[in-house]
């Protein structure tokens, strides 16, 4: 077997492409490699089974642990259900590919990207997105491509292309920009309160790089002698659209201009018009072409009626500057927000509502042991902030079985999570593991941004000292030829019938997250720039409403939340705290009824539902790890007797020896004549020898003049068993 090889030099790196060798029964395939990262991406098309008004596109991303030289855990020792990371990358592939296929095509298309080798310097996700375009092109599948994606990072004042995992972690920006020859089709970003202007410059920087990769794909097709197949829309029978335009335009326009209608009332009135139209068609003669068409295809009336409604709604926005609920283009829906709505057994809670979209968010404070371990190819080993988004069927007035979270729920949860991470306090300031759950109680657009707002409110209610509150809004777009209208705070029908869903989240200082999806084949940076700038006043307005509910963290935590103390010790003394076989740390936890976690860097976290117990454990550990100095006086307990002296525990786990000659001013024949095991004595540190051994004395020490660290008066310390 022979394949065709091509190398692309991009940003000083070599991207290697192999086509025609792997997966010969797929419509198209490519092995795309950079550094030691290798992905096999396939695109397969099968003929459509029945007419459809949506695109049956499936995008999958597979992570095999052998790609990182690892064997899966668990009894079966094989990969199970896809990890969250794989789901998010599958969505990252789907979102820029979907608008580049015509929905009328209807053929089933599946794109599968398999990560076969992973180099930590070369993240696989953007390679998978570009590989999806190449596999589709070489498979001669009709497609408005080529399409490519790049990641842009920001370190200091410099943008960098396709940063490594380490560079992403160090930087203030992680943005993926995907584009076609017509413009940008997808954006996914997390940022550290980056200004709007810097964000726009990063997008522009990324799209310039995207155009290079698009040109490379065009050159590849030319080298392979493949002519790209551009989708060609079949000629549409105008009989039914003309009939609907004549009979339904005015009734639909009247409904769209009734600005006081609720979503449900508007939907019912539109459905009534469609039902009446169906009755009129049924009364036509059997040989009438309109009746014949609708009889042959029951879905045709629904599809064409929806197209007419879409056309009229868009026309109203373009020509009149009015939306279906009467708002101006830049107007935000009515907002209400409240915090602390649930009993304090829930550590933090909030309800956020914007229009008919309503989200209940809750926050739970956990201990370090509650962190989520990551069993995937991401170099990060654990997550300490979790956001889970749930979208039950009742939120849209539907009934269906409630199952595990789908891709959409995972994606929305990840977006809201990314928006909050930049404002979370550091571990040493607030060492809790945090889990926020957002329950969508009612949906009419922008539930993910409602979850961002609800998350902020519930975190503050839980007492989390956020660096700044975060709000978010979804921006929309109507584009007809050269006429462009940007919409602020889109609702469901505007998302469904519009051209863009652009979610923008951030603080009053700058942006923390972006997510843009398109239904057209691309937009110039200038329009995206306008949308980002117009989102800012909306975000600030929403922030002000949120701060009316709660404007700072609660001063005290829920009485049902664990109490955590966090402090740092010398990493070289971690072994001292743990003790042989864990004896010392186990003794501390049993004695104080606490949980203790120690990180490799020396950060100690103590968890307890009793604050006093946590403080006691902290004192013990600080005593274990502090240095003892000559001349210090301690109150301690005699732990054992030997013929030449007695051992005294002066701090938890730290002993010194009193030589028999130092037990008294007078001569002592037997140690037991002065002290016995278990006696409390006051001793002074006489000497610390070259081996670190502590020599103590009772001579010249008044039994009522001692001190123990860190208290100013003697405090007996029982030995740890």
Swiss-Prot record:
- Cite the entry's keywords alphabetically: Cytoplasm, Magnesium, Metal-binding, Nucleotidyltransferase, RNA-binding, Transferase
Enumerate the residue ranges of region (Disordered): 701-721
InterPro entries according to UniProt: ExoRNase_PH_dom1, ExoRNase_PH_dom2, ExoRNase_PH_dom2_sf, KH_dom, KH_dom_type_1, KH_dom_type_1_sf, NA-bd_OB-fold, PNPase
Q: GO CC terms on record?
A: cytosol
SMART domains, per database record: KH (SM00322), S1 (SM00316)
Q: Where is the KH domain?
A: 562-621
Q: Which SUPFAM superfamilies match?
A: Eukaryotic type KH-domain (KH-domain type I) (SSF54791), Nucleic acid-binding proteins (SSF50249), Ribonuclease PH domain 2-like (SSF55666), Ribosomal protein S5 domain 2-like (SSF54211)
GO MF annotations, alphabetized: 3'-5'-RNA exonuclease activity; magnesium ion binding; polyribonucleotide nucleotidyltransferase activity; RNA binding
Subcellular location per UniProt equals:
Cytoplasm
Q: Does the keyword Nucleus apply?
A: no
**Could you tell me the Gene Ontology terms of the biological process aspect for this record?**
mRNA catabolic process; RNA processing
Q: Which reaction does it catalyse?
A: RNA(n+1) + phosphate = RNA(n) + a ribonucleoside 5'-diphosphate
- In short, the EC number is 2.7.7.8
Compositional bias, Pro residues, is annotated for: 711-721
Q: Which residues form the S1 motif domain?
A: 631-699
Q: What is its main location?
A: cytoplasm
> Which coenzyme or cofactor does it need?
Mg(2+)
Which parts of the sequence bind Mg(2+)?
495, 501
Q: Which family does it belong to?
A: Belongs to the polyribonucleotide nucleotidyltransferase family.
* Biological role stated in the UniProt entry: Involved in mRNA degradation. Catalyzes the phosphorolysis of single-stranded polyribonucleotides processively in the 3'- to 5'-direction.
Query: What is the protein name stated in its UniProt record?
Result: Polyribonucleotide nucleotidyltransferase
Q: Which gene encodes it?
A: pnp
């Amino acid at each position: 077997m022979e394949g065709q090889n091509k190398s692309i030099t991009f940003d000083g790196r070599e991207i290697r492409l192999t086509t025609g060798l792997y997966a010969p029964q797929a419509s198209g395939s490519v092995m795309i490699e950079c550094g030691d990262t290798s992905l096999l991406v396939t695109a397969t098309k099968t003929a459509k089974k029945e007419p459809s008004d949506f695109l049956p596109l499936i995008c999958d991303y597979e992570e095999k642990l052998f790609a990182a030289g690892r064997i899966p855990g668990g009894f079966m020792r094989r990969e199970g259900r896809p990890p969250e990371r794989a789901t998010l990358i599958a969505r990252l592939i789907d979102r820029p590919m979907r608008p580049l296929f015509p929905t009328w095509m209807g053929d089933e298309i599946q794109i599968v990207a398999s990560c076969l080798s992973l180099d930590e310097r070369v993240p696989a996700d953007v390679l998978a997105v570009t590989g999806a375009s190449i596999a589709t092109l070489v498979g001669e599948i009709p497609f408005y491509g080529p399409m490519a994606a790049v990641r842009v990072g920001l370190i200091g004042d410099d943008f960098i292309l396709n940063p490594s995992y380490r560079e992403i972690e160090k930087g203030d920006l992680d943005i993926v920009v995907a584009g076609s020859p017509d413009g940008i089709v997808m954006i996914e970003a997390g940022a550290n309160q980056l200004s709007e202007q810097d964000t726009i410059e990063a997008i522009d920087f990324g799209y310039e790089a995207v155009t290079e990769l698009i040109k490379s794909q065009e050159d590849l097709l030319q080298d392979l002698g493949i002519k790209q197949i551009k989708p060609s829309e079949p000629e549409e029978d105008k009989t039914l659209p003309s009939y609907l335009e004549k009979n339904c335009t005015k009734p639909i326009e009247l409904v769209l201009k009734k600005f006081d209608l609720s979503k449900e009332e508007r939907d019912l009135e539109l459905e009534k018009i469609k039902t009446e139209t169906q009755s009129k068609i049924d009364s036509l003669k059997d040989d009438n072409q309109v009746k014949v068409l609708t009889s042959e295809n029951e879905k045709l009336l629904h599809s064409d009626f929806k197209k007419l409604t879409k056309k009229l709604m868009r026309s109203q926005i373009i020509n009149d500057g009015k939306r279906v609920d009467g708002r101006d283009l830049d107007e935000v829906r009515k907002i209400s927000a409240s915090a602390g709505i649930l009993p304090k057994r829930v550590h933090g809670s909030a309800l956020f509502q914007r229009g008919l979209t309503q989200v209940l968010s809750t926050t739970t404070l956990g201990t370090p042991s509650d962190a989520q371990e990551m069993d995937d190819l991401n170099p990060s080993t654990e997550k300490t902030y979790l956001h889970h988004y749930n979208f039950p069927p009742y939120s849209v007035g539907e009934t269906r079985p409630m199952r595990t979270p789908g891709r959409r729920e995972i994606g929305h949860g990840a977006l809201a999570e990314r928006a909050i991470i930049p404002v979370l306090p550091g571990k040493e300031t607030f060492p809790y593991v945090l889990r926020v759950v957002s329950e969508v109680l009612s949906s009419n657009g922008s539930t993910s941004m409602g979850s961002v707002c609800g998350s902020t409110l519930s975190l503050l209610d839980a007492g989390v000292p956020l660096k700044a509150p975060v709000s978010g809004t979804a921006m929309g777009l109507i584009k007809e030829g050269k006429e462009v209208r940007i919409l602020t705070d889109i609702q469901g029908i505007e998302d469904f019938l519009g051209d863009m869903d652009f979610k923008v989240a951030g603080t009053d200082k700058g942006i923390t997250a972006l997510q843009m999806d398109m239904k057209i084949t691309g937009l110039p940076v200038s329009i995206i720039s306008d949308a980002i700038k117009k989102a800012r006043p909306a975000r600030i307005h929403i922030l002000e409403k949120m701060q009316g509910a709660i404007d700072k963290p609660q001063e005290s935590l829920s009485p049902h939340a664990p109490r955590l103390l966090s402090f740092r010790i010398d990493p070289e003394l971690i072994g001292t705290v743990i003790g042989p076989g864990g004896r010392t740390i186990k003794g501390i936890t049993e004695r104080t009824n606490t949980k203790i976690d120690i990180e490799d860097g020396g950060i100690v976290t103590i968890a307890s539902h009793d604050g006093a117990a946590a403080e006691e454990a902290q004192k013990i550990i600080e005593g274990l790890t502090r240095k003892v100095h000559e001349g210090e006086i301690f109150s301690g307990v005699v732990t054992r007797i030997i013929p030449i002296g007695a051992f005294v525990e002066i701090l938890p786990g730290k002993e010194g020896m009193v030589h028999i000659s130092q037990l008294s001013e007078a001569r002592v024949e037997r140690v037991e004549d002065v002290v016995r095991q278990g006696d409390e004595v006051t001793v002074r540190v006489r000497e610390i020898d070259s081996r670190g051994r502590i020599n103590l004395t009772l001579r010249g020490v008044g039994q009522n003049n001692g001190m123990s660290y860190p208290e100013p008066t003697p405090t007996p310390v029982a030995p740890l068993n």
